[in-house]
Amino acid sequence: MKKVKVQAIDINKTFGGGNDKVVAISDFNLEVKENEFTVLVGPSGCGKSTFLYMVAGFEKPTSGKILLDGKPITKPGPDRGFVFQEFVLYPWRTVLNNVTFGLEIAGVPKEVGRERAMHLIEMVGLDGFENAYPHTLSGGMKQRVGIARALAYDPEVLLMDEPFGSLDAQTRKIMQGELIGIWEKMKKTVIFVTHSVIEATYLADKIIVMTARPGRVKGIVDVDLARPRDYTGKKYLRIRGEVLGLLEEEVMKSLGKTLGKT
């Protein structure tokens, strides 16, 4: 049995105070197993990204705790890599130097960092582009750089906040396949946030469906499908339908409506 890698225990997160107080997450509990690909879906504003930021150490819970290998997360660390939705690249640095940036800050010897970065650049399909600058790259290529940079520290957990959300449909589909290929080679623990049920069902070992704000776990759907997955397969469509069924009412709630009303 796989061990629990990340555990959220009775998490509550609020922003602001008084009349401006917003409860983003309430009574949130979750276990993510080692080497598992876990995907969070839920309505806009339900706290998916907030939870990811707390696992990263960028935000702290108002109450409760998040554990990594049984130890509380209190700050960012090299054991967690983060891929943002936007292409957060340094425009004055080449692909290679974007990937090595964090390693340079950490004091990793230049040649060691370069060798590691070149290996990752090849893995994400950008060999030959190591000397290119971000403005010359397509959106999909930029996000490949972001993935390589997040993996440069060899983190145990990879956190991904809607990384393909701004890509066109065809590029997004290609990137999903490439991400699974990388994950199968490196077997990282992945926590991935998306609005797309299609994407979630294609990628995940386990899908966490969150309620409307304040976010909590509404349901957990195991995706017992071989990879690569067929978007038109009966079992795939059944699982996708199950997730949509859990999600529909929460989306309506987030819009201030109830089922059956217009």
Predicted regions and their residues:
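Short coil-to-helix segment of the ABC ATPase nucleotide-binding domain corresponding to the Q-loop/switch region
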Residues: 93-100
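Catalytic Walker B motif of ABC-type/P-loop ATPase nucleotide-binding domains
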Residues: 158-161
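Hydrophobic anchor residue at the start of the ABC signature
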Residues: 147
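Conserved signature/switch motifs of ABC ATPase nucleotide-binding domains
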Residues: 132-135, 153
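Helix-to-loop junction immediately C-terminal to a conserved catalytic motif
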Residues: 56
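The feature captures the beta-strand-to-loop junction immediately N-terminal to the Walker
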Residues: 41-43
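Conserved ABC ATPase "signature" region
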Residues: 100, 104, 111-129, 181
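Conserved ABC transporter NBD signature motif
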Residues: 64-76
